[in-house]
Amino acid sequence: MQLFEQILSCYGWEGAALAGATLLMLGVQLYYYIFVYGRIPGYKNNRRPQTLDREPSVSVVVPLFSEDYSFVEERLPLILAQNYPDFEVVIVYVGHDSDFYEDLVRLKQSFPQITTTKIHLDPRFPISRKMALNVGIKSAHYECMVFTSTDAVPQTDRWLSLMAKGFMRGEIVVGYCGVERGKGFSNYMMRAWRMMHSADWIARAVQRRAYRGTLHNYGFTKSLYFGANGFSHLNMNIGEDDLFMQRVMTRDNVSVILSPRASLREKMWGGMGWWMSQLRYFGSAFRFYPRAVKTFVRWEIGSRVLFFATVVCALAVMPPEYKLAALLLAVIRYVVVAFEVRRIARRLGEGGIAGRYFIYDLLGPLWAAALGAMLLRRDNRVWR
């Protein structure tokens, strides 16, 4: 109380209000990075009760929407080389190239664990990823299924083993998928954005309040899928990894697999413009999230912006000692943020992010604002 009265006498109501707003936003930021994101590095899924007594057989389902020989020659072998005793790879080819499909079928001669099915592509009736996954689920021979994409690259031969172990403690398994590492500012921003936005749903999942996974690295059981009567929001081409998952996720049926050996990397097919287009496409589902989830996601960015604004205001108009105090609070916040980001990056197998994180820390809200403006316009690619 004496401190407040001293601030009030020295700097007036304006200075006291500014100090209060700065401290409040700092408190929100520290709460997020220490008590929310800070739980990610120390999380252990094996603390959850075990429901299966042995590692299950697993079907890996991969939708293939083009004649992608680079996937067949480069990324499919990494899936087939997984160090796991009993699994199959279900490839759902959506297209009309008979020669390419025959090449896929012939792969079974060398790799018996491959199961291939085809959906004929008719331009009059577009096939969504949900439809392809539905066919893959029905074609899978095993109860436990892991879903990935043709763009995702396993980093080790332990990926499938670790994901499969998750089914011993839950009907749903979620893992992390980062962005492939490259050179330049754009690649760094894309990698940092992916990691920190993944930290949102991972942090909620380790708190047993899961609301989504990533379409490149997640799984669930057949019983769960058919018990929910399949995917939801069938008028949308997206939502299989979030809107559907929100229907079936509970406090007790989600396993979170966090390990550099279980992480994937998504191959990038363009620069910043392509990436923003992807964020707009998949981000169109966000408006249908529960209000509590939207509030949780927005408060971190909002409190960061308000904290920066109060510090800038203090540096611009307040006396020297006030400026020094505001600058000290900014330094304290960044030290805490950088420390926690480094811990999270280490747990997820991300390198080269923490050292330059101040770039993303400052520019991330501007990027989020640009994406929010893009989402105000309807994306016709989303709707059927």
Task: Walk through the language-model features, giving the residues of each.
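Short aromatic/hydrophobic "clamp" motif used to bind/position activated sugar donors
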Residues: 145
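Acidic donor-binding segment of Leloir-type glycosyltransferases
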Residues: 76-123
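Acidic donor-binding/catalytic loop of UDP-sugar-dependent glycosyltransferases
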Residues: 150-165
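N-terminal membrane-anchoring/stem segments of glycan-assembly enzymes
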Residues: 1-52, 341
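Membrane-embedded multi-pass helical conduit in multi-pass membrane proteins
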Residues: 304-380
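Cell-envelope/extracellular polymer assembly enzymes that use nucleotide-activated donors
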Residues: 56-59, 88
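Catalytic donor/gating beta->alpha subdomain of glycosyltransferases that bind UDP-sugars
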Residues: 172-197, 223-226, 231-294
